[in-house]
């Protein structure tokens, strides 16, 4: 059985848009660059040709990866999950015990994780600890060095 890729509807839509861009924009662009580089003649010392071929290989690999993720996407359905329970697709806000600054993250599938925009993978150490917990729960979150104790203050 193939691995499934749990994700939000938004994440699936982003992957579909990326795939369309790769196939309709990026692939034709790199093919044109290869044609131009070939027109320069000798390919043995043609760095533009080599760079374009490398980019083409990357694009084709990414197309294959994205197609697989779309094919085996598993859209999360939180209808049966309690409103105050942390789950994939939900936003969770917590505060370190003894502190006042809140931190908020959306827990998403690995394919759509982007910590810089507040989206953490459901497979990350912090998400694994938080999933299934509820507002008011106090948990120990692993850090690269040690851990911190946090209280879940909001889930939506």
Swiss-Prot record:
Pfam families: GreA_GreB, GreA_GreB_N. GO terms for molecular function: DNA binding; RNA polymerase binding. InterPro entries: GreA/GreB_C_sf, TF_GreA/GreB_CS, Tscrpt_elong_fac_GreA, Tscrpt_elong_fac_GreA/B, Tscrpt_elong_fac_GreA/B_C, Tscrpt_elong_fac_GreA/B_fam, Tscrpt_elong_fac_GreA/B_N, Tscrpt_elong_fac_GreA/B_N_sf. Residues 2-27 form a coiled coil. GO terms for biological process: DNA-templated transcription elongation; regulation of DNA-templated transcription elongation. Keywords: Coiled coil, DNA-binding, Transcription, Transcription regulation. Necessary for efficient RNA polymerase transcription elongation past template-encoded arresting sites. The arresting sites in DNA have the property of trapping a certain fraction of elongating RNA polymerases that pass through, resulting in locked ternary complexes. Cleavage of the nascent transcript by cleavage factors such as GreA or GreB allows the resumption of elongation from the new 3'terminus. GreA releases sequences of 2 to 3 nucleotides. Belongs to the GreA/GreB family. This is Transcription elongation factor GreA. The lineage of its organism: Bacteria, Bacillati, Bacillota, Bacilli, Lactobacillales.
């Amino acid at each position: 059985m193939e691995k499934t890729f749990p994700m939000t509807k938004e994440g699936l839509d982003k992957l579909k848009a990326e795939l369309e861009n790769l196939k309709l924009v990026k692939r034709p662009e790199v093919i044109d660059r290869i044609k131009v580089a070939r027109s320069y003649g000798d390919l043995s010392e043609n760095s533009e040709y080599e760079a374009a071929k490398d980019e083409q290989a990357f694009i084709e690999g990414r197309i294959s990866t994205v197609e697989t993720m779309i094919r085996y996407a598993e859209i999360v359905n939180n209808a049966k999950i309690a409103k105050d329970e942390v789950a994939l697709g939900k936003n969770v806000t917590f505060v370190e015990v003894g502190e006042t600054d809140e931190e908020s993250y959306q827990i998403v599938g690995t394919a759509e994780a982007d910590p810089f925009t507040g989206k953490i993978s459901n497979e990350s150490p912090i998400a694994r600890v938080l999933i299934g917990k509820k507002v008011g729960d106090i948990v120990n979150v692993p850090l690269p060095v040690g851990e911190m104790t946090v209280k879940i203050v909001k889930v939506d």
